[in-house]
Regions:
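Compositionally biased terminal segments of proteins
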Residues: 1-135
């Protein structure tokens, strides 16, 4: 089932899983190949979320970054990877600021949690703390 399509993205639901295919202006190496599909590593996906967050504030990206930083990678690792992938097009300082700025968030895409829901204030408090933590 196709959910929606824009100029550079198309969103599907395949076997109850939301899948997005996008055209991306940067060349990224695929770390994983699953059933013939190339996928970036989790760290590269986190870096792409960091890059996107500076230009668009979608709640789903904050939620994804919350889980990635809570369970997998530090903000330092994500910023380092984003610098490698995007060079001067990425600004780590702006990313850190955006992690603690919640006034213009777009909530149009509902977040569906696997397992227990996490309350919004838990996510915002965690990300704010991370954004102010020393490198």
């Amino acid at each position: 089932q196709t959910l929606f399509e824009s100029g550079d993205e198309i969103h599907f639901i395949i076997s109850d899983v939301k899948v997005t295919f996008m055209q991306f202006p940067y060349k990224l190496k695929s770390a994983n190949h699953i059933h013939g599909l190339s996928m970036s590593s989790l760290l590269s996906l986190a870096a792409m979320k960091a890059y996107a967050l500076v230009g668009r504030a979608k709640w789903k990206d904050y939620v994804d970054l919350y889980f990635i930083m809570k369970d997998h990678y530090s903000i330092k690792e994500i910023i380092k990877k984003a610098d490698e992938l995007f060079g001067s097009s990425f600004n780590g300082r702006f990313f850190r600021q955006q992690l603690s700025y919640f006034d213009d968030i777009n909530y149009t895409e509902k977040v569906e949690y696997v397992g227990e829901d996490v309350q919004d204030h838990i996510i915002t408090e965690f990300l704010t703390e991370i954004s102010y933590s020393p490198f």
